[in-house]
Amino acid sequence: MKLMVLVFTIGLTLLLGVQAMPANRLSCYRKILKDHNCHNLPEGVADLTQIDVNVQDHFWDGKGCEMICYCNFSELLCCPKDVFFGPKISFVIPCNNQ
């Protein structure tokens, strides 16, 4: 029984001592807007491009079409498109990365 407790303690110590490896996935993040206005985006987010004129307050972040941002009053919420829309409909969202 003591051996079992010792093995468990050593195993738990090793698990807690190992640093977690970050996943190779993109994650969500928020950007606070200084002027609290989605129509006048600040200079710091100049890499945003509007998805479509019919889809208000939704932007592609960066040059690709992997991250999408939604402007909600005082902040931008940016997530990978699969997280934002779900994998079943994310492929139908128009992407103009030119």
Curated annotation (Swiss-Prot):
Signal peptide: 1-20
UniProt family annotation: Belongs to the SCRG1 family.
Source species of the chain: Homo sapiens (Human)
Tissue: Expressed abundantly in the central nervous system of adult, but not at all in fetal brain. High levels of SCRG1 transcripts are also observed in testis and aorta.
Highest taxon of the lineage: Eukaryota
Pfam short name (any one): SCRG1
Keyword Signal: yes
Identification of the protein by name: Scrapie-responsive protein 1
Localization per Swiss-Prot or TrEMBL: Secreted
PANTHER family: SCRAPIE-RESPONSIVE PROTEIN 1, SCRAPIE-RESPONSIVE PROTEIN 1 SCRG1
Ligase is among the record's keywords: no
GO cellular component terms attached to this protein's record: extracellular space; Golgi apparatus; neuron projection terminus
Any single GO BP term: nervous system development
Xref: InterPro entries: SCRG1
Residues glycosylated per entry: 72
Keywords: Glycoprotein, Secreted, Signal
